[in-house]
Regions:
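Short, exposed beta-strand/loop patches in secreted or surface proteins that constitute
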Residues: 45, 68-72, 95-97, 137-142, ...
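A short, amphipathic edge element
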Residues: 63-64, 128-140, 190
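N- and C-terminal low-complexity/disordered segments
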Residues: 71-74, 98-99, 108-111, 174, ...
Length: 224
């Protein structure tokens, strides 16, 4: 969970109105550098895909499991949440992650509003088979993810602080596509099912016309 302070312009007042925007996000907890720095330093950065595709997304983090439809185009992706994300401002049915803009957009259709959040590593998904900071890879053998045959690997990565993390990684051997990544050291995994490699339209990754854009800044979760 993240608390986000939202600044809304109130035409009846000279002072901005403050809201607490509570959203359940993809908290990956990778401890990587700021996004711009990480992208510049890494050969296999999270959040950037070498090809365009759509897939059914399943992820689990901090005991929470969620499902969505995912659309990916290079340095941007669209997540259509099953059931939506409950926030203090209503339900966000869609999240758009834009690495080029360094922004994440929550789309609240009922309010015709887009909440814009600064991009952090919390929002990045892995798309490449070779992982950022990978130091070793061991083939375990044949496996299955959903209805797809897969090769299962054990992969060890090291972050910039020298801390290591072990993953199990399932790869589609025919298309060399990442199907599932599961941490052995924490309660986290991400899975891509029914992956269709195809061109994705640009408008999937833009904010809807006529929607109000408001900005949010991260704040500490209140104690108690």
């Amino acid at each position: 969970m993240k608390w986000l302070t939202v600044f809304l312009n109130n035409p009846q007042s000279h002072k901005p109105t403050y809201w607490c925007f509570l959203a359940c996000v993809l908290v990956l907890g990778l401890g990587v550098p700021p996004v711009k720095e990480a992208l510049a330093q890494s050969e296999n950065p999270w959040g950037i895909s070498p090809f365009e595709f759509s897939a059914r997304l399943i992820w689990k983090t901090e005991g929470r499991k969620a499902k969505a439809q995912l659309f990916v185009k290079s340095d941007r992706y669209r997540i259509e949440h099953l059931g939506g994300i409950r926030t203090e401002l209503g339900y966000a049915g869609v999240t758009i992650v834009r690495l080029d803009e360094q922004k994440v957009w929550y789309i609240l259709s009922e309010r015709r509003t887009v909440v814009s959040v600064p991009l952090t590593s919390d929002y990045l998904l892995p798309f490449t088979v070779r992982l950022e900071g990978e130091t070793s890879r061991t083939l375990i053998g044949d496996s299955v993810v959903g209805d797809r045959s897969a090769m299962l690997y054990e992969v060890v990565v090291e972050d910039r602080f020298g801390q290591t993390e072990r993953f199990f990684e399932w790869v589609d051997p025919d298309r060399n596509i990442l199907l599932k990544l599961l941490s052995q050291d924490r309660d986290w995994f991400v899975e891509y099912g029914h992956v269709v490699v195809s061109s994705q339209p640009d408008y999937y990754f833009e904010t809807p016309l006529g929607y109000r854009m408001i900005e949010a800044q991260e704040a500490q979760i209140p104690k108690g």
